């Protein structure tokens, strides 16, 4: 099993998806959430998560408001567990993980599902991710690794792939038994220690995960001071990096994906509605001889194939009633 490399003094960033290549840089701390459209998700083959278990909250802020409204005790198992799951979800968005909470009575042991949009994979399918959160005060044994392995066999549709990654998250660091079991596993697995306030403390992954191309992944310990200048307290934080650069926040990734999808649709030279964009993908999948995402996202489709797609789409649109 591999312990994430430790790096010091690097303060750069990485653009996850551009039609042009950018150098490493830092991103602004201001975030704007870009909800991906069905068209964008389909273009990049991003699966949609199952329906959430709760209708009254979908992030930490709305959960805390709901918990206060119903007077849910903060020490209750439900409050502690749900709070931690949303905290983990929020923390991992910093590292290009888009996650949804699905934990509930019939969750098959899975708390969060989503995709990991690592740099250099912008032309490929993002890694599907299954997450188990173990918000326990006691030490965790090797059985939690075997439990995570079992979730692969019960994963939702869209997460039953050979590239699906399992992530165990706990406020406690991995014991030797956990590390050894993780190393022997034939599944691509990660262990992350995330404290209840969202601070990342430890990140480990096994050799099987390495095969999926996460070699450039590393860590950096960054130091700072508290906002209270008089106290002079020094803070330290572990962050994940990619080839020595900051991994972009998921908000930035979503913006890039949205912009790329719009540019891709516009590149066909047709003024298409949302429905017609989906039909363009339908036609491309029927006309093109190879995988549509590999051809279209890499912009390697030939002029002849492009003309075939446009002609087939125009014929389909002409056959539709004018109201559409």
Predicted regions, residues:
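Mixed-charge (Asp/Glu-Lys/Arg
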Residues: 2-324
């Amino acid at each position: 099993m591999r312990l994430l490399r430790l790096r010091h003094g690097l303060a750069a960033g990485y653009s996850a998806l551009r039609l042009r290549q950018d150098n490493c840089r830092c991103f602004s701390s201001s975030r704007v959430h870009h909800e991906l459209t069905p068209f964008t998700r389909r273009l990049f083959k991003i699966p949609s998560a199952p329906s959430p278990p709760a209708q009254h909250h979908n992030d930490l802020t709305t959960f805390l408001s709901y918990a206060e409204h119903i007077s849910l005790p903060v020490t209750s198992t439900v409050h502690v567990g749900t709070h931690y799951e949303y905290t983990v979800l929020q923390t991992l968005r910093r590292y290009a993980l888009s996650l949804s909470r699905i934990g509930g009575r019939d969750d098959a042991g899975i708390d969060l599902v989503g995709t990991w949009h690592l740099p250099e994979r912008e032309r490929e399918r993002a890694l599907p991710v299954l997450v188990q959160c173990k918000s326990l005060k006691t030490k965790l044994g090797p059985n939690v690794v075997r439990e995570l392995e079992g979730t692969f066999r019960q994963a939702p549709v869209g997460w039953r792939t050979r590239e699906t990654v399992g992530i165990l998250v706990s406020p406690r660091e991995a014991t030797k038994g956990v590390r050894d079991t993780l190393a022997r596993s034939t599944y691509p697995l990660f262990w992350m220690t995330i404290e209840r306030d969202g601070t990342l403390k430890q990140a480990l992954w096994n050799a099987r995960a390495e095969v999926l191309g996460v070699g450039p992944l590393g860590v950096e310990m960054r130091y700072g001071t508290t906002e209270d200048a008089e106290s002079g307290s020094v803070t330290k934080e572990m962050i994940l990096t990619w080839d020595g650069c900051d991994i972009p926040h998921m908000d930035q990734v979503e913006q890039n994906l949205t912009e790329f999808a719009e540019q891709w649709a516009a590149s066909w030279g047709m003024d298409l509605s949302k429905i017609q964009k989906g039909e363009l993908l339908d036609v491309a999948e029927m006309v093109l001889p190879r995988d549509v995402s590999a051809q279209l996202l890499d912009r390697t489709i030939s002029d002849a194939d492009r003309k075939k797609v446009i002609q087939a789409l125009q014929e389909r649109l002409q056959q539709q009633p004018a109201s559409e």
